[in-house]
Amino acid sequence: MKSVITNAAEITVLEPIDNNYKTGGGPVSVGGCVVVATKGRPFVPHEIFGVGTSQEDTFGKPLPKKAYGMEGLRQLSEAAKECNWVQTVRVVNSTEYRYPSQAYLLFKERGDWAAGTLYMPGDVVTHGGQQFIAAAEHTAATPPAVGSGEWLAYTGPVEKDSHRYNEKVLVGDDGYWLVLYPIDGDASLKRTVRIEDVDTEKERFRLVLYDKDDTGYEYELESLLVGIGEDDKDDMGRPAYIETVFETQSTRFRCDFLEGTTWSELEPILLALEHKKATPQGVSFEGGTSGGEPEIDDWLKAVELLRRESLPLNMLFAAGISDPDVLARMTEIADYRHIAFFFDVPSYLSYRGAMDWLKNLGLKSRHARAYYAPFEASDPWRGGKTVWGVSGAMAAAKARGNAIFTKNVPGVHYSPAGEKRGYLSRTGVACLFPDETLNRDTLYTARLNPVIPMTSGGACADDDLTQHFLENYLRFGWINDTLDYIDQRFVEAARIAKFEPDGLTYEILYKLMKQILDELVTSGALVKPRDPEQDGNKEYIITITQVEIDLWHVEWAVCITGAARRIAGQPRLMK
């Protein structure tokens, strides 16, 4: 059936016209942060979910209490429990971090060295109680010796090396048939590799990777049955080629295989390396390290990944970062992306010290919120009491509000403060400075949100102010959250209308903006103006103007709901 009208005498059915565009519908509680961890591929966003063991599998346990960067994973854990997920980047010292590799030699045992014999690269001989491997094709005339150019000292069938985070590992053409390396950022110092179940008929073998826990117990990480033919299939019809198996079945390791290597070349090597009960063999990794403390450039490099608009993100939290330059960059990214940013004044500071610290920081942004939480709490990971900040907990509080749906509309206008949403999910909460009294007026002037004890136990955030110092509505967090939500959906609508002709452009923009704002009226995010004489009695007003032939200007005036920050009771005596 044709779908194009031509001069032919035929019946044509045209493609359907569908102008039923919509925006929204995606997750609205995706967090973002940067952490220090013992493992996890560095400088790459990882999606961390609050269910299962997603965080510990990716990054390991939170660091010891006195370790550099110990707050990060603790705060991430709190955020991930309530957020849809958290885009998390591991930062490392890029000059000192190393990941290990194992390079397997393509060798052939030739026994004792003999004069007049033709030797090929990879041939291994014994002479004078030492082993040598041929480095070049030659006919033996003089006994093997290191430095001759014909022989190298043979140290074993596997060579070990380590590499920088952005260094690629390739098998090359210098005598190796396989290079194996971790991709999960683990230093792999307790990991070993075994070759098992060499099948000479099907021309396959099994690579089994092991690790050890803190008690020294060895357990299996992965077991992969592989072949060396690019078209090889396993018994279930899945690709069995070694590189494909690692890419599709392994989350921790990758390999590079020397193309063109034949089974006849590998079989004696595999049989010599095969792990058996009678002859147990395992190859360990060496040289992997997390390096020292990350430098400021490393932090900025990691944080900058959160700027990418292709990365879904609705909020940022500092996760224990207190460096002014890094906080300033995260604030800049939040302003650029129109999303909230939660950060802590260091919890170990006294009230006066906290005020001075925030003043010296000097941030100014309608998206940044500062919190002061001088509390310790029970540490579920390391035991005892530990002090860590609340930026992750505030991301969780924001997610709790977003999860209050009215039909399909998230509760973006709910403030992440108070006992209902702004509480800390911690036990054994105790104040570090119980004798100090907070001056709430001074806190307001500094736009510093205090975390205070609750009468029912625990603690909660007791204000929702941004680092915006003008006396207008933009100083309130929930106002900006609602504006940002509208901004994000407007961008979706504008993308749909982009490059359409005038009439269709106006229709799409008006229809979609009206849909967005009507939904927010239904949810209670938008309310009738408090000054009807000045602003009228409609919750919103949309104005669309074509400024130039290729430029459209869309304005939405909205009245956003308030929040009961202040409640006054007036006693009155009667006769």
How would you label these PLM feature ranges?
Residues F107-P157:
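Tryptophan-rich substrate-binding surfaces of secreted polymer-degrading and adhesive proteins
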Residues E539-K575:
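C-terminal edge-of-domain segments
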Residues Y510-K514, L573-K575:
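Active/binding-pocket-proximal capping segment
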Residues T126, V208-K212, C559:
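A generic structural motif
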Residues P143, G216-E218, D325, A563-I567:
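Intrinsically disordered, low-complexity acidic/polar segments
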Residues P45, V124, Q131, R566-A568:
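Well-ordered beta-strand positions in beta-sheet-rich domains
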Residues M1-E109, P157-L509, I516-G536, I541, ...:
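A glycine- and small-residue-enriched flexible loop/hinge signal that marks low-structured segments
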Residues Q131-F132, F205-L207, W552:
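Hydrophobic residues embedded in beta-strands of well-ordered beta-sheets
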